Amino acid sequence: MQASSEYKVLADEILTGVVTQTKIGSIVKDLVLIVMFACVMALCAQIVIKLPGTVVPITGQTFGVLLAGGTLGSKRAPLSMLLYMLIGMLGVGVFAPAVADVNEFGSLHAILPWAGSDGLVWSIPTGGYIVGFIFASWIIGRLAEKGWDRKPKI
């Protein structure tokens, strides 16, 4: 295959022929995947390892971005990250817990009890990362569409 060949991403490979006989079925499938991965991202955000001396913890969000990009591709993955960001900005506690919230659980917090934070991305310490998730998921999705998730290209 040529270097410019397009590959199917994981979601398209697994869901081949599922409710895609019509344009509406395809749109519904895409919307369900976008919402589902916004929820996966909210779950990944709750996996937190607090680092001493910083307000930005290590979270499972990095895994969530990579998973969304590789699974959904460059069109749906950024939309799922954008939806995740908008849900948090609307007041739902889907972002990683603040370091103060993590302190009451020790240095590690794993999903339950739910301690997510919310707020405008430009007013929280991790806001730049959240905006960056949109671009990172697009890059990973594009690489997956080029076949970089199948074999080394070096």
For each predicted feature, which ranges?
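Short helix-perturbing small/polar motifs within transmembrane alpha-helices
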Residues: 2-22, 29, 35, 43, ...
